[in-house]
Amino acid sequence: MKQHHYMKYLFVLLLFLPTCLMAQNKEEKMPGHITKIQKLEDVNVTGNRPHFIRLKGYYRSYQTNDSVMKYFNDGIVEYYINLKNGKTDLNAYSKRNLHNSRLVSEDKKRAFMVSDEGTFRPWPEGKTLIEQYRKKYQLKDSLGSQLVLLNQQTIGSIQTDSSRNICQIEINQLPTYKNLTHQLFGYTQTDIYDHVVETYQISPEDYYSFKDLLFQKSDNSYLFSHKKDKQQQLIHVITELYITEKEYVEKKQSIKQDSSTPKESAAAITDFCNRNKIPSLPEATEQEMQQLTPYNPANMKEIKE
């Protein structure tokens, strides 16, 4: 997971939780969303000499500004992870890009514009959270889990469920940042929350590799404003990735241009989520999403059907 995206790629969240947020309660269990993750079918091997792992899944990323939904993006994705160097290639299709046209129209036009959009498509590449934090921070065994410590402060936990062959890491990344406030072209962003979860299928080789990823979630909040604004906006972004298929393959499929209309993409996404039992959005969030309009992220213009 890349640590800090700059102003254009900012992420966000709803509530600011205490810094010591995990594994403090002796009765604590693995979070509820874990139980909703579907176990992958037996992994197929295509060809005699596989060079890639193909992961297929669904992602969604949505943003609110002062508790009003402004952006929603989701879609079906295939990641090809090179078994030799770990590099990832993406094949995305049935993408859906929605925005709140009223809020977007109210954005003040300035000579130097910095977009407040923080939604993004997950990109599993590089080091996993477990790899990063095992090397950088102290780990302490505690009640069947490991606590992640920074200067004796609990910032996360690593838990395993051997009965389901699952490992999960949760981290509050905010205490690891050197600077919480960033400025660019008169805009100021102040991070107030950054919580990340990664869940893996445990494997005999390397249970914290991205090739064993089942679920990934980032949940972030920041304050955002221009120096001429009278008040700051509270921006909140949640991004989730659910892996539904895993296969060893010899070569990547060629990336095809996605020419689906918004209606076609919505129908394909709904069918995929139903078949793979992807957890539904909260009802209120779903209703807000239904009020948004399709747009082209290349030029931010609305798409008429």
Give residue ranges: language-model regions.
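Bacterial Sec-dependent N-terminal signal peptides
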Residues: 1-29
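Surface-exposed, low-complexity/disordered segments
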Residues: 25-305
